[in-house]
Amino acid sequence: AVEGAYQNGDMVDVVSNKGRYLGTGWMNDHSKIRVRIISRNANDTFDEAFFRRRVRYALDYRRTVMGETDYRCCRLIFGEADQFPGLTVDRFENILVTQVLSLGMERRKDWVYRALVELLREDGEQVDAIYERNDVTIRTLEGLEQGKGFYQMEGLKTDLSGHVTITENRIKYDVDYMEGQKTGFFLDQKYNRQAAAKLARGRRVLDCFTHTGAFALN
């Protein structure tokens, strides 16, 4: 049951049947996921500074775990795993490709995008553009419009070709982030490709149903 008035996308507290606080998330009664939890701290204030701290943590974690080379080609934000429900951010060198799949995240994406650009640049990283790949049907289920295109922000480009060359596991790829599946390349499979390469070494292997050929190239 819901107590009090709300609009879809608003932050709401979730409590147990005994009134115990369980977490806070954004509400959307159009979605099959009624509430997406973003925090389990009742003292959090969900302003721009809150999301900036979350972005800072995600960036620092990647840099520590992946090192400088892989950091230029990786998934910077991985949805709920980074406590950003419904948000994917992939970095392809100087291009950030995003996908927003929840109404609550859509309403707060400007804060997150601004934090990404500013914090990456503070770290000495170049960011030329943000390209949104919101051309997915799940957005319709969230009550959101589908679409794709360059995100408009001062200092970002909006006239790039849609292709970028990346290096992953010492292999170069031409990524089509405008027309390729999802964000253009499955960066979340980076370590699976490394594992497959070890298993396949010295063997003849058939790569079926390939998208970019990344598993075979490894």
Language-model features: locations:
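A short interface-forming secondary-structure element
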Residues: 93-106
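S-adenosylmethionine
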Residues: 1-24, 102, 154, 164-171, ...
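Non-catalytic substrate-recognition/targeting regions of SAM-dependent transferases
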Residues: 79-90, 110-185, 194
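Conserved hydrophobic/aromatic pocket- or pore-lining residues that grip, position, or stack substrates
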Residues: 94, 173, 192, 209
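Short, surface-exposed beta-strand-loop junctions and turns on beta-sheet-rich folds
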Residues: 31, 104-106, 181-182
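Conserved SAM/SAH cofactor-binding pocket of Class I
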Residues: 195-218
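Non-catalytic accessory regions of SAM-dependent methyltransferases
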Residues: 1-93
